[in-house]
Amino acid sequence: MEGQTRSGSARPGTRTGLGPLPGTHGVLQAEIPSKKVNSSFQLPAKNSGPASSEPRLTLAPVGPRAAVSPPSERPRLVLSSPRPVLAPLSIAGEQKRPPPPHSSNRAAKSVGQLVVSAAAASKPPPVASVSILAPKSLGQLVISASAMPRPSPAPLGSVLTPTSRDQKQLSPTSVGPKPALATSGLSLALASQEQPPQSPSSPSPVPSPVLSPSQEGHLAAASVTSTPASERQLPARQKDTAVPRPTPPADKCLYTPERAAGPATSPPRAQAFSDPRLSPSFRARPEAPRHSPEDPVLPPPPQTLPLDVSPGLPESGTRSPGLLSPTFRPGIPSSQTVPPPLPKPPRSPSRSPSRSPNRSPCLPPAPEVALPKPVTQAAGSGRCPSPNLQAQESPAAATTTTSPTSSWSAQPTCKSDPGFRITVVTWNVGTAMPPDDVTSLLHLGSGHDNDGADMIAIGLQEVNSMINKRLKDALFTDQWSELFMDALGPFNFVLVSTVRMQGVILLLFAKYYHLPFLRDVQTDCTRTGLGGYWGNKGGVSVRLAAFGHMLCFLNCHLPAHMDKAEQRKDNFQTILSLQQFQGPGAHGILDHDLVFWFGDLNFRIESYDLHFVKFAIDSNQLHQLWEKDQLNMAKNTWPILKGFQEGPLNFAPTFKFDVGTNKYDTSAKKRKPAWTDRILWKVKAPSGGPSPSGRESHRLQVTQHSYRSHMEYTVSDHKPVAAQFILQFAFRDDVPLVRLEVADEWARPEQAVVRYRVETVFARSSWDWIGLYRVGFRHCKDYVAYVWAKHEEVDGNIYQVTFSEESLPKGHGDFILGYYSHHHSILIGVTEPFQISLPTSESASSSTDSSGTSSEGEDDSTLELLAPKSRSPSPGKSKRHRSRSPGLARFPSLALHPSSRERRGGSRSPSPQSRQLPRVAPDRGHSSSSRGSSEEGPSGLPGPWAFPPSVPRSLGLLPALRLETVDPGGGGSWGADQEAPDPNSLSPSPQGRLGLEEGGLGP
């Protein structure tokens, strides 16, 4: 009632009087003292709103009289107006609070509003005369107000007023938005030169130089009447917002009485709302739905902030992609609009995450508020920063994507999401041994899940590849790979893929909870040394689809020396042309949505001599060397480099140093320093069609967060270089192919039951299996136990498997379950960490099987089997005879090496408590002990299977080693007089009859 009383007094007093005003130009000054002419129009004004409670205060004029001739187009305004001026007045007064008192500038802007409504409004002749005179009087009032000295702002804030459509700003003296006009979607004006600083509600009135109270009352009725007509400039869904709504949330967002008190300047309209969700620092929380499709409340009109978080139901075809709310997805049923809350790994033991829980919703707000729209240029945000910027880890604005329950989400990401973060590292190690610590090189941050990267690509060159070293690396994991796996494992990173070509290695890691959304992983390599016959030079690559976007990582080692620039160009073209990938996605390297090209590219600095280069480095004038860098020059001349981008070279050249120091080459050769180690990226230009993943052309944006070298590592003559990138996806394909369900805790062996649901598009294989991993596992084969995924249907597309008691780890710990797909060669479904608390007192009895063989005295030299051509713990694909272990996909090409986890005492065998090799009974359909799971295999045969006679007794891997297989004839059990072989001995069994339990060779 208070707002209505104040606004009611404003209408007849200050804003728009309802009395007839003379229609000619010269009558205005003569009619000012007279109030009798206006008396006939006071009754409609009273009917349209409450009576005036403070008429004298609202009649206060602003400045001295200034007679100005009105515009000539105002009379034409009346002739085109078919609508009565006072018709909608009662509607606005019934449902909305009338505008509070305002200065004469308000009347002038209301007449501007009247101009908009006059083209389509219908007014009778008596009202037409009022409309003719009102603009004239207000024109004089505006000019006189702008010409006079401005008093201090009024204690009561004025109201936002709509003006012409081309004005998009606010009045600096306005404090709160006007409810009746904010919902209509009209633009707000910032007219500091024309606005009187004192409100009509000021307690110190001054004589009116222009209008009488009744004449101002006329203008108030006309301005209020013009509001519905101006709404025709808006879309249909915004017209509806002008209809009064009694909903409290809308009132709170549109008007706050507290902010109308006090002389405060108003922020822009998008920030003037009292709702904290609309403030620039507000972080949209993914788990809090913005609106529901059933909500009848419509959103406000487009604002300066690109994120629309007001409640409302978007009508089809009326909402632009740039204004999509974080939870709006076109074409998705209403029940799928609200995403489930993000899981927070690794502490909430629950179910399989349906998406990548990469970000906690409680992140601090990003410093930047502006959010790039999905339709912006894909490579626009990836431009190089200014050269004067230091390559430091400055914060970058990024975005988050909520996870839907549909197959993909098409909404723009939220402001609070730091995006998908990728760290790329390149290092020419110069055949050196790995250092002790690489934490700073990998930018792992504080170890918190919200710090650091989501994916890390590591490219190494000149890894020791001598014959004896290569033979050792063929049997054992190379030391560099072990170093990075050991360093990244505690940070929840898992090795996704790796490829090696002599001394060139590429390792790709990702957080374990991203694995279900990384698909179609493939590798390739190209030799360019000695005409393509030697792999000391060339390139290795890993490509994959991350959340539906095709990414490719290319690690190259190109020819050296100053005069080999053209040869480097030819080698790069050869690598791009020869490396092709299979599948429906991108085939060539440049066909991917995003390509990272890095390595020891060996580009040098031309023209300048050694002394000038060192002087520029010592004086920190690196920009003088940029224009003579061969790669920078090649970007402008080589067509093959079109579209590749690189950050500023704000770090010193990374080659060549004396090993063990930070001094440049002091040998007799005195090599000139150069930026040989580089990291570039290229975003595929939008072609107007779908991306290789089948989505829209505007797919992602790339921003380089940092680009620097690491001078603290001195083991090589090169310094490692690292770059951090932030990827902002326009959509995320974030639905796992398999969802695993498990209890929060396994306190008894009977609880070791796993249920999983598969998507209809998932191509299952009989080689699929489910592994049990400790938190911090290093790669997909680093499991504690496993069970074959037999796909026995339980309910619809829900399946169930059970881990045997013998395969379960004893004691207490945090574990993760993962579904390994043979076709995808990666975990396509994982759970959140859960607890296993099994009593350790049962370990002795459970570790003894029916053969009576004790596991005491067994050493920790469990052998891990790898295909010799594979640098990944994952075995190569094969269609040969099936093994009982997921680690044995093929037999003729197996290699042995002890696992580092075994050296630490952990079990790598799928059955940690029964690793003693028992004798297999003659009946090949039964076994004396269970392996992995006591249930039937995928083929329906009970228990573990025996090897067929075609498997040789000795695999001939090493002269001193011979692996015994199950006796094809079955044999008999151990007799009382037979001596069991020493399990610590690797020599062949003298009896030659020790059976090898099937699957015992598994990793």
Curated annotation (Swiss-Prot):
Region Disordered, residue ranges: 1-110, 147-414, 839-1003
SMART domains registered for this protein in UniProt: IPPc (SM00128)
Short motif (RSXSXX motif 3): ranges: 871-876
Membrane found in the keyword field: no
Region annotated Catalytic, chain positions: 422-725
Listed transmembrane segments: none
Motif (RSXSXX motif 2): 351-356
Domain of life per record: Eukaryota
Compositionally skewed regions (Pro residues) per UniProt: 197-210, 338-348
Motif RSXSXX motif 4, chain ranges: 882-887
UniProt motif (SH3-binding) ranges: 346-351
Annotated stretches, region: Required for ruffle localization: 726-837
Positions carrying Asymmetric dimethylarginine: R56, R76, R83
Enzyme type, top EC level: hydrolase
Function according to Swiss-Prot or TrEMBL: Inositol 5-phosphatase, which converts inositol 1,4,5-trisphosphate to inositol 1,4-bisphosphate. Also converts phosphatidylinositol 4,5-bisphosphate to phosphatidylinositol 4-phosphate and inositol 1,3,4,5-tetrakisphosphate to inositol 1,3,4-trisphosphate in vitro. May be involved in modulation of the function of inositol and phosphatidylinositol polyphosphate-binding proteins that are present at membranes ruffles.
Official protein name in the record: Phosphatidylinositol 4,5-bisphosphate 5-phosphatase A
Native organism: Mus musculus (Mouse)
UniProt lineage: Eukaryota, Metazoa, Chordata, Craniata, Vertebrata
